[in-house]
């Protein structure tokens, strides 16, 4: 059963029925443990910082009730919802990005599958109606092979947040083909091609909801949001990093996304908000994964402490603390 939707202020599409579609239903947690809803925000390569947070969930023995993700957060969220542990995600990421030449060859072998020549591929991507890289092919080259084909094959309910280009509204996907939904959530115009799905043209969900902690609608006791979208900052040495052309194209929209997050937090905040100190990394710094992991360790410990406090509070409300 699909959820009904309504629009508020012409800005976002929201669920109006109590509960979620059948494909995202999950039993309440047992005993005195609260249920957790985890929102993973967008931020390009900074999204690698989501992995230590997911490791923390495993270390605490917390199985999320539901996960939502935007852009890179959708990619990470789907992988975790498929049953891949945080530790295995770290290993996969390290293996993938430690071999720069191999990953580039792997990527372009997928891209060339749409045409028998690289020249043909470039010709297509320069066409105004087919901008740049096809996201589904990119994901097929980079994602772990364990991912199921559909949302229904996931072990944890998952919501992919996208933007309907023509309606200019949020569109949340919770069922059907998985890879196209993730590709749509991460389809940054000018970099990845928009995705046609459900009769809609979908682009990066960050344009309407870069930190989707408000899509759960009371589905869990504790809502945690991981914000990996800090704006450009000075490097570790205190000097400004002058962005490349691509970094300027990809990173400039982050200014608007951060504004959206700030305005959301003024009226509605998650129970737990974690912001790893990763502002000195650029959105395309995927090959700096080890440095991002290291920079995220403090946020991981902060998240664990926040979860433990939330569990204690929940037990006290039950009279068991």
Question: What is the predicted role of each segment?
Answer:
Residues 1-70, 78-321:
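Patatin-like phospholipase
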């Amino acid at each position: 059963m699909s959820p009904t939707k309504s629009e508020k202020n012409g800005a976002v599409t929201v669920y109006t029925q109590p509960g979620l579609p059948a494909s995202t239903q999950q039993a309440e947690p047992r005993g005195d443990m609260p249920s957790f809803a985890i929102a993973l925000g967008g931020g390009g390569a900074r999204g690698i910082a989501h992995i230590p947070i997911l490791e923390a969930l495993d270390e605490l023995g917390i199985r999320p009730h539901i996960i939502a993700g935007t852009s890179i957060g959708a990619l990470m969220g789907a992988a975790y919802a498929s049953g891949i542990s945080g530790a295995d995600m770290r290993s996969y990421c390290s293996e993938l990005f430690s071999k720069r030449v191999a990953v580039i060859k792997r990527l372009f072998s997928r891209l060339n599958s749409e045409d028998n020549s690289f020249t043909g591929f470039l010709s297509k991507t320069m066409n105004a109606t087919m901008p740049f890289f096809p996201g589904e092919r990119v994901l097929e080259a980079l994602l772990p092979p364990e991912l199921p084909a559909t949302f229904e094959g996931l072990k944890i309910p998952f919501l992919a947040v996208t933007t309907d280009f023509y309606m200019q509204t949020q569109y949340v996907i919770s069922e059907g083909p998985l890879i196209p939904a993730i590709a749509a959530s991460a389809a940054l115009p000018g970099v990845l091609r928009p995705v046609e799905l459900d009769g809609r043209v979908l682009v990066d969900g960050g344009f309407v909801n870069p930190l989707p902690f408000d899509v759960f609608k009371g589905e869990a006791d504790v809502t945690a949001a991981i914000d990996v979208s800090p704006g450009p900052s000075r490097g570790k040495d205190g000097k400004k990093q002058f962005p490349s052309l691509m970094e300027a194209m990809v990173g400039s929209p982050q200014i608007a996304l951060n504004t959206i997050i700030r305005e959301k937090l003024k009226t509605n905040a998650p129970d737990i908000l974690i912001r790893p100190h990763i502002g000195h990394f650029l959105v395309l710094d995927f090959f700096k994964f080890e440095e991002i992991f290291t920079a995220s360790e403090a946020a991981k410990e902060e998240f664990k402490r926040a979860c433990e406090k939330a569990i204690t509070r929940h037990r006290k409300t039950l009279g068991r603390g």
